[in-house]
Design a protein with these regions (language model features):
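Negatively charged
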Residues: 1-132
Length: 132
């Protein structure tokens, strides 16, 4: 298991992609993503992880990702039980600000135990590309 730092200090634009991929029991993620790097690529940041807790759910955090890639950020994860509403609302704010929706495609692809996400994952949802 990788030790999660207390802050984003030390992360650069070149090392955010897959930074925590395939980790287990990530329970000490910083409660705030304040100071996260302005990376153009957060793709697969937590892909394949299990037991993720402590993911910030504030709308503002997710809106701040701007046009950075968050493709497959949580793909193939298990036990994602955090409330998706602030995340999705933040992503919606980002997209309504002119940023492209495709940068979040497959964000939750292959995930299991998405008990709070069914309304967002439906084929008719504007968020459906995040789940396929």
């Amino acid at each position: 298991m990788k030790k999660i730092p207390d802050s984003w200090e030390g992360f650069t634009a070149s090392n955010c992609n897959s930074a925590f991929a395939n980790c287990t029991s990530l329970t000490d993620i910083p409660s705030s993503w304040e100071g996260k790097p302005s990376s153009p690529n957060y793709a697969s940041l937590f892909e394949g992880c299990t037991s993720l807790t402590g993911i910030p759910t504030a709308q503002e955090v997710w809106a701040e990702f701007g046009n950075a890639s968050i493709v497959r950020m949580f793909a193939n994860c298990t036990s994602l039980t955090m409330d998706p509403t602030p995340i999705m609302d933040g992503l919606n704010r980002r997209e309504s600000g002119g940023y492209s929706a495709h940068i979040g495609s497959q964000m939750f692809a292959g995930c299991v135990n998405l008990q709070h996400y069914s309304e967002y994952a439906s084929p008719t949802s504007v968020y459906s590309s995040y789940f396929i």
